[in-house]
């Protein structure tokens, strides 16, 4: 009997996608008659996550009171534990002023089709000072060089809140038909496979040897039935490797180096926030909604630059997440690297006798340089099959310059 962890804040998932085809067609027809507005990429990604059940139990976009409460207390105004405001922020609301029901248009799909219909609860204005205070709490900085802060502060001062009905999954279902999955379908597949105890690995990058072994370590330590490799498919910062390349490299690694039927490779439709500790908690919330019992949280999880301490994304679970707020557990990981002494990948904290020279360590910049020149990183760092896919990508990129 499979008994998965319960969804967050609910007995069942609450996906906001209109699954009934007749109802969806009728809603689409209605949408074309409604006042409409093109929303931000971030707001569209929020709609996709709500559509797919990942953001259970939310029924729509948060209001200003929720935004301020989540930023200050990690709870919505009515007390639901939630780490990051889920917002529809606009610069201009003249097209929807006074409207009670509106159509939301997708900026990421050609022709800007309607992605959702919204019952408008409120249109509220936040001051620049209020938004900066929220950024400070959520991102731990107001520095506009931080990509998440830059996006948040550029989104607009109007907060449009209310329940939504979602018509589609934006570009994710079409562009990533084999990888994009809803929380509903992931949870159902766990049941079909008989997996009770599942460890999730979050990634926005290709997976090298250290990541591969980290998944194995977690699976063995937790006696997990399987691993969910769950990759972000939405927008990243400039210079990050696109989702289709990451997808291909991860699939190759799993095909060659993991036993059959022990790993599920899936993706979710969200734009990276780079919110470090707060985003790590959000990752835990929606992996619980998928049915995962554990989430691997390592060094610099969901971070960028030097904005966060190496283990801030772990300590937030002890310091800011109340007991009982989440059912999912965290598998705390240190940096993993190949030990020349032991001839295997280890967690660096487990080998206090090692010096830096005892590990195969390469910076991201160095790896990018090598791949661009057609030089494979050492096999202790990256599997040759993975390195080949990445070399092909970087060389094509350089050739196109």
Curated annotation (Swiss-Prot):
UniProt keywords (A-Z) are:
ATP-binding, Nucleotide-binding, Nucleotidyltransferase, Transferase
One molecular function GO term is: ATP binding
Query: What is the organism of origin for this protein?
Result: Alcanivorax borkumensis (strain ATCC 700651 / DSM 11573 / NCIMB 13689 / SK2)
Top enzyme category: transferase
Q: Which NCBIfam families match?
A: PRK04149.1, sopT
Name the cystine pairs: none
Q: Which Gene3D superfamilies match?
A: HUPs (3.40.50.620), Sulfate adenylyltransferase (3.10.400.10)
UniProt name for this protein:
Sulfate adenylyltransferase
Q: Which Pfam families match?
A: ATP-sulfurylase, PUA_2
């Amino acid at each position: 009997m499979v008994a998965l962890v319960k969804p967050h804040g609910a007995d069942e998932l609450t996906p906001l996608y209109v699954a009934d085809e007749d109802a969806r067609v009728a809603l689409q027809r209605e949408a074309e008659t409604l006042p409409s507005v093109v929303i931000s990429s971030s707001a569209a990604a929020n709609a996709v996550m709500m559509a797919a059940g990942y953001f259970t139990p939310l029924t729509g976009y948060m209001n200003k009171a929720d935004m301020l409460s989540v930023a200050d207390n990690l709870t919505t105004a009515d007390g639901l534990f939630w780490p990051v405001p889920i917002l529809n922020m606009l610069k201009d609301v003249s097209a929807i002023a006074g409207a009670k029901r509106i159509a939301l248009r997708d900026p990421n799909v050609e022709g800007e089709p309607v992605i959702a219909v919204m019952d408008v609860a409120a249109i509220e204005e936040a001051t620049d000072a209020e938004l900066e205070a929220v950024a400070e709490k959520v991102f731990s900085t107001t520095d506009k060089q931080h990509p998440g802060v830059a996006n948040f502060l550029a989104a607009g001062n109007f907060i449009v809140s209310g329940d939504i009905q979602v018509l589609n999954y934006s570009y994710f279902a079409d562009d990533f038909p084999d990888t994009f999955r809803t929380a509903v379908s992931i949870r159902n597949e766990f049941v079909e496979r008989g997996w009770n105890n599942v460890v999730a690995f979050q990634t926005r990058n290709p997976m090298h040897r250290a990541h591969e072994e980290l998944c194995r370590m977690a699976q063995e330590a937790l006696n997990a039935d399987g691993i969910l490799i769950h990759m972000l498919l939405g927008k990243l910062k400039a210079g990050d490797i696109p989702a289709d390349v990451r997808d291909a490299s991860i699939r190759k690694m799993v095909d060659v180096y993991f036993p059959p039927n022990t790993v599920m490779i899936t993706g979710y439709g969200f734009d990276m926030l780079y919110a470090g500790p707060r985003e790590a908690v959000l990752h835990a919330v929606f992996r619980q909604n998928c049915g995962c019992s554990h989430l691997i949280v390592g060094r610099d999880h969901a971070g960028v630059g030097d904005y966060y301490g190496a283990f801030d994304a772990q300590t937030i679970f002890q310091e800011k997440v109340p007991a009982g707020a989440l059912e999912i557990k965290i598998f705390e990981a240190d940096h993993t690297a190949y030990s020349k002494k032991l001839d295997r990948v280890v967690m660096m904290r487990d080998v206090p006798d090692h010096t830096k020279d005892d590990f195969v360590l390469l910076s991201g910049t160095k790896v990018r340089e090598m791949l661009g020149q057609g030089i494979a990183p050492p096999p202790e760092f990256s599997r040759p099959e993975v390195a080949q896919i990445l070399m092909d990508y970087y060389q094509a990129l350089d050739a196109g310059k």
